[in-house]
C-alpha cells in the first residue's frame, strides 16, 4: 500500500502515545501519575447537563445540523461582548467548531498552500505544528524565553521568514508556560502582522483560568485585530465540557468564512444537544467559571 507523503511528517499524537502507556500500566496494576492531556476533572454545571439531556430526548435533535443554530451564534456574540468587550457580527464572524482542536487542525488547510511558512510559538500545543504539516506548510518556531516573560519577540524573527510567512499562531494565556500577554504585546503583534501581511490565529482557551487577580483578554479586544485575525475559544476548560466537543472561531469575516467553507466539505455540523448545552454555558450563571478558576488556583497554591 502507498499512503500520502504527508503522513511521513506526522507522528501519532503525543497524547495518544502517552494514553497507551497509561493504559498498559493500569492493566498491570502499576501506579499512574497522569500529567498528559490535562482533561478537566470538574464536571459541567447541572444546568448545562440538564439542557443537554432534555435536547437529547427530542427526535429532531438527531437530524443533520448543517447550519449552526442562530441562538448559538447569538449567545457567542453576547458572551464576547459581556466578557471581552468585543462586538461580533452574528452572521459572518461566528463559527461553531467540534472543539477548538478541530479548528486549529483545519485552519492551515484553509489558509495555506504547500510550501508556505507558518509561525508557531515554541514550546507549544502539538496541533499548532500538526495542522500546518497536514497542509504541506513549513514551520518556523518563535521562541518564548523566560527573559522576555515568555512573550514572543517579533523583532527577532528573520526578515526573510517574516516576508514569506502566511499566518502565525498566538496562544495567551499560554500553554504550557502560563504566561499572560500584555496590551503592548498584542499591539505589537497586530502591527507586525499588518507590516508583513501575516494573518493571526489566536488560541484563547485559557482566558478564564488566570490567577492572582490578573485578567485574560481576547486578542480581538485590540484595535485592528479583526483586520488581521481570528480567535479560537474552548468550552473544555471554563465549563468542563471537554468530552462534549464544542468550540468557536470568531473574528475576521473572510478568515471565518473560508474555514466555514472548508468545514462544509468535512462535516455536517455539531450535534444539536451540544450546541444547546453550549448556549446554556455561555448565557447561564457564570459562577461555575469563577468556582473552577478558584479550584485550580487552590491546587496550584
Where are these regions (language model features)?
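A short helix->loop->beta-strand "cap" motif at the edges of active sites that frequently abuts
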Residues: 116, 137, 195-199, 225-227
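N-terminal small-domain helix-loop-helix segment of the aminotransferase-like
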Residues: 2-99, 106, 281-284
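PLP-dependent aminotransferase-like
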Residues: 90, 109-170, 191
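Helix C-cap/helix->beta junction micro-motif
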Residues: 25-28, 135, 195-196
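Active-site phosphate-binding strand-loop segment of PLP-dependent enzymes
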Residues: 145-214
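Conserved core segment of the aminotransferase class I/II
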Residues: 224-297
Amino acid at each position: 500500500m502507498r499512503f500520502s507523503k504527508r503522513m511521513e511528517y506526522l507522528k501519532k499524537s503525543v497524547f495518544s502515545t502517552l494514553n497507551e502507556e497509561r493504559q498498559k500500566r493500569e492493566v498491570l496494576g502499576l501506579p499512574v501519575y497522569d500529567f498528559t492531556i490535562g482533561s478537566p476533572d470538574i464536571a459541567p454545571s447541572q444546568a448545562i447537563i440538564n439542557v443537554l439531556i432534555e435536547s437529547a430526548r427530542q427526535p429532531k435533535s438527531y437530524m443533520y445540523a448543517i447550519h449552526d443554530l442562530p441562538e448559538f451564534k447569538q449567545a457567542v456574540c453576547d458572551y464576547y461582548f459581556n466578557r471581552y468587550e468585543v462586538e461580533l457580527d452574528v452572521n459572518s464572524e461566528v463559527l461553531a467548531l467540534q472543539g477548538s482542536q478541530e479548528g486549529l487542525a483545519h485552519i492551515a488547510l484553509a489558509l495555506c498552500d504547500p510550501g508556505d511558512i507558518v509561525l508557531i510559538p515554541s514550546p507549544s500545543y502539538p496541533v499548532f505544528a500538526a495542522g500546518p504539516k497536514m497542509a504541506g506548510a513549513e514551520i518556523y518556531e518563535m521562541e518564548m524565553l523566560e527573559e522576555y516573560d515568555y512573550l514572543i519577540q517579533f523583532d527577532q524573527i528573520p526578515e526573510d521568514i517574516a516576508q514569506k510567512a502566511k499566518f502565525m499562531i498566538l496562544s495567551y494565556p499560554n500553554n504550557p508556560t502560563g504566561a499572560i500577554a500584555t496590551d503592548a504585546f498584542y499591539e505589537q503583534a497586530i502591527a507586525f502582522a499588518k507590516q508583513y501581511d501575516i494573518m493571526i490565529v489566536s488560541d484563547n482557551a485559557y482566558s478564564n483560568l488566570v490567577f492572582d487577580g490578573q485578567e485574560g483578554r481576547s486578542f480581538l479586544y485590540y484595535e485592528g485585530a479583526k483586520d488581521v485575525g481570528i480567535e479560537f475559544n474552548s468550552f473544555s476548560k471554563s465549563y468542563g465540557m471537554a468530552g462534549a466537543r464544542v468550540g468557536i472561531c470568531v473574528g475576521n469575516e473572510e478568515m471565518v468564512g473560508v474555514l466555514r467553507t472548508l468545514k462544509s466539505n468535512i462535516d455536517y455540523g455539531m450535534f444539536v444537544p451540544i450546541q444547546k448545552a453550549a448556549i446554556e454555558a455561555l448565557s447561564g450563571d457564570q459562577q461555575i467559571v469563577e468556582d473552577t478558576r478558584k479550584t485550580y488556583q487552590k491546587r496550584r497554591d
